[in-house]
Amino acid sequence: MLTFIGLGLYDERSITVEGRDALRAADRAFAEFYTSTLVGTTVEALEAFHDTPIEVRERAGVEQDPEEVLAAAENDDVAFLTAGDTMISTTHVDLRLRARDRGVETRVVHGTTAQAAASALTGLQNYRFGEATTLPFAYAHGADGLPASVTETIDENRERGLHTLVYLDIKVDNEAAVARAGDEELEEYMTADTAAGYLTETYPDAPGVVVARAGSPDPTVAADRLEALADGAFGGPLHLLVVPGDLHHVERDALADLADAPAELLD
């Protein structure tokens, strides 16, 4: 049995009760933190909280050579852990399909997603979001300006009046994920002000909404023009950015109240 368990958004307590029970019942637990990570905890704290040893896998050990995970699941109850919800990433869907091809029974225990939290914290209605996109670090996509994948997604959503959730790039070495070292060489998180600065070059007058540390005790939500957000400071990671489309009157009220949106942004 291979059980995919979403750990939620922030720390060792963000997991659901169902996920906690499944993890504690597993014979063996694997995790990966390169697609996303829990900035409010460490692997050591997760292990202590759940009284379960956790083996952290490198990217190659999940995407290219998952044999150890699959072989273990053929004979034992294995838990595979990720931040957020495990089935948001194509990598994890692929791992599940590989397991099923080998006759391994699979199960999914969902966790809270960043998209659900962004909608809840901002008051932007979930069904009014279009396709999401990821904004990489400038050095990561090897070209000047914004990647076409980002601009095309935002443009298509805006044409339809839909909001765009922009995931911001992270680079986390497994050593940092385990120790939460804070070493700049081991972990790097794009901030919302940096992302707003990138987007301002193409969308100088567009509004934006920052969501920082969703799932933590002290989340930050702020709405303004992207050029204004580019000069802001929103505290520690993880950050998300939303580029709103057309706003329902309840969404306008929510942004004014929950995100301190200036009146001129909502006209």
Feature locations, PLM:
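Class I S-adenosyl-L-methionine
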Residues: 1-105, 109
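Beta-strand/loop-alpha-helix module characteristic of Rossmann-like adenine-cofactor folds
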Residues: 2-5, 116-267
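Short alpha-helices
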Residues: 83, 93-95, 104, 110-125, ...
